[in-house]
Amino acid sequence: MSRELFEKIDTTIRRERLYAELDLMREDVMKRFGIGRHHLNDLLNSYADGLSFPQYINSIRLERARDLMISCPELTIADVARRVGFTAPNLREQFKRMYGVTPQEFKAKQ
């Protein structure tokens, strides 16, 4: 049941693009799925490599940003950031931390 619940949460966040909301809060997800903080944390620990909620959402945002830069090279970095729920400076910082290059460097190699 727990894995199914995590997959339902993950699918909803991705399909409905909840990750793109700048003000998305853990409480929004908890309320929507009728679970408490501890239960959500347990799900993330078990099925999202132990990531915290902000880390989990950022990982989805970064994955989507990378996909957008590949599939829509005409988009500016600011456009990509807006579409995935980051500010441009935050996308730059988080992207570099995860992938070892800036979004601009990544785009230049595509």
Regions found by a protein language model. Name each.
Residues 1-9, 25, 58-61, 73:
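N-terminal positioning helix adjacent to the helix-turn-helix/winged-helix DNA-binding module
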Residues 47-83, 109-110:
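Terminal helix-turn-helix DNA-binding modules in bacterial transcription factors
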Residues 44-52, 95-106:
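A secondary-structure capping/hinge motif
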Residues 27, 38, 75-78, 89, ...:
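Residues within helix-turn-helix
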